[in-house]
Amino acid sequence: MPLSASLLGKNSTYKDSYDATLLFKIPRINNRNELGINSNNLPFYGVDIWNTYELSCLNKNGKPWVGVGTFYIPTDSENIVESKSFKLYLNSFNNFVVESIEELERIILQDLSNVTHAKVTGQIFPINTKIEFGLPSGKNIDDLNIECNNYCPPDNSLIEYEDVLVEEEINSNLLKSNCLVTGQPDWGTIVIKYRGKKLKHDSFLKYLISFRNYNEFAEQCAERIFTDINNSINPDFLSIYIVYTRRGGIDICPYRSLDQNYNLPSNKRLIRQ
């Protein structure tokens, strides 16, 4: 179905009964074709981490239960899930009776796997689980004294480098783009690890800021940034991790890496989550 058929930007009615058909799929291939990415031979590995904070159901006695969930959608999935449809889907469990939280987890993982055409993993946690806040790893580049005048479209010509090999990790809290359909802001913290020609931090920060008024889904922004860096410096190693702020009870955190045997970064919430 075309993106115009989704519920994004439209008035919606919350279903009072569980309904897996609420999940709306978006093919990854459309954006990847634009970026020159071969979906049959991806230049990266990774996942999209979805953290959900509005999750509830009823136990067999009719008593409500609330929790949080974390779900991992692999980058080789055929589709992503449109976030508003996922919110409506999760809320369709509000009056749904389950025998156990394990049953709820199984249902959600199966539904997500069906719509994305991939093996989705994840876990649901009780609401009283202790969660610690974290800090983005690496050197923050936000305090650099730069002059900016490009806020759209993203300009990969701004990525400059020095002809010296380094291994470093940098981060920025200044990444912002807008939802492709609604124009709502997506605020993100990005962490980049790489080994290769040294990125000039001032020009790279300008590049990140050039996304500021750009309309694109979060997962697609991540792959655009990864592709632009990879094409610019051809690093021996590269990974990017973007932690987006919560909207509609959900935050999305894409991770991409050149390393097939990658280790996922800590999924600790940052201060803006």
UniProtKB/Swiss-Prot annotation:
PANTHER family: NADPH-DEPENDENT 7-CYANO-7-DEAZAGUANINE REDUCTASE. Keywords: Cytoplasm, NADP, Oxidoreductase, Queuosine biosynthesis. Substrate binds at V81, E82, S83, A218, E219. NADPH binds at S83, K84, R247, G248. Belongs to the GTP cyclohydrolase I family. QueF type 2 subfamily. Homodimer. The gene is queF. This is NADPH-dependent 7-cyano-7-deazaguanine reductase. It comes from Rickettsia canadensis (strain McKiel). It is found in: Cytoplasm. GO terms for cellular component: cytoplasm. Its main location: cytoplasm. It catalyses: 7-aminomethyl-7-carbaguanine + 2 NADP(+) = 7-cyano-7-deazaguanine + 2 NADPH + 3 H(+). It comes from the Bacteria. Pathway: tRNA modification; tRNA-queuosine biosynthesis. GO terms for biological process: queuosine biosynthetic process; tRNA modification. NCBIfam families: QueF. Catalyzes the NADPH-dependent reduction of 7-cyano-7-deazaguanine (preQ0) to 7-aminomethyl-7-deazaguanine (preQ1).
